[in-house]
Amino acid sequence: MRLLGLDIGSKTVGVSVSDELGITAQKLETIKIDETKYNFGMRPLKKLVRQYEVDGFVLGLPKNMDGTSGASVARSKAYGKRLEEKFGLPVHYSDERLTTIESRRVLVEDAGIHDRKKRKQVIDQMAAVLILQNYLDLHRKD
């Protein structure tokens, strides 16, 4: 089963994809969105769904550190509902607390990307990878 992982932000959506066996996640791209113009990035997502023959989505659920839900959780769930309506595919959610911080650490410490502009270009994709990989690891059938 192939899934797209999404890190939903206010201006961008980081996108990752799983392999066909649902074992690993890899980064794909960052899609610019503009909620004020009702541009939610559905056109580029449609291309990716077709290209990778996707079976569903995994969205990050940005809960507060104490486990409560805030406005960002509502945004992710609303985005998930749009995806279900547009594509008719299942949408799953994965706790994304600290994924952006972890992404930044990986990019600086492991990949050696110290340039802030370069990091900004891939941080949403990396967060999407972590969201999807966490989901895959939790749901792996050994």
Swiss-Prot record:
GO terms for molecular function: nuclease activity. InterPro entries: RNaseH-like_sf (IPR012337), YqgF (IPR005227), YqgF/RNaseH-like_dom (IPR006641), YqgF/RNaseH-like_dom_sf (IPR037027). Its EC number is 3.1.-.-. One of its GO terms (cellular component) is cytosol. It is found in: Cytoplasm. Keywords: Cytoplasm, Hydrolase, Nuclease, Ribosome biogenesis. CDD domains: YqgF. It is an enzyme of class 3 (hydrolase). The keyword Cytoplasm applies. GO terms for biological process: rRNA 5'-end processing. Belongs to the YqgF nuclease family. Could be a nuclease involved in processing of the 5'-end of pre-16S rRNA. PANTHER family: POLYNUCLEOTIDYL TRANSFERASE, RIBONUCLEASE H-LIKE SUPERFAMILY PROTEIN. This is Putative pre-16S rRNA nuclease.
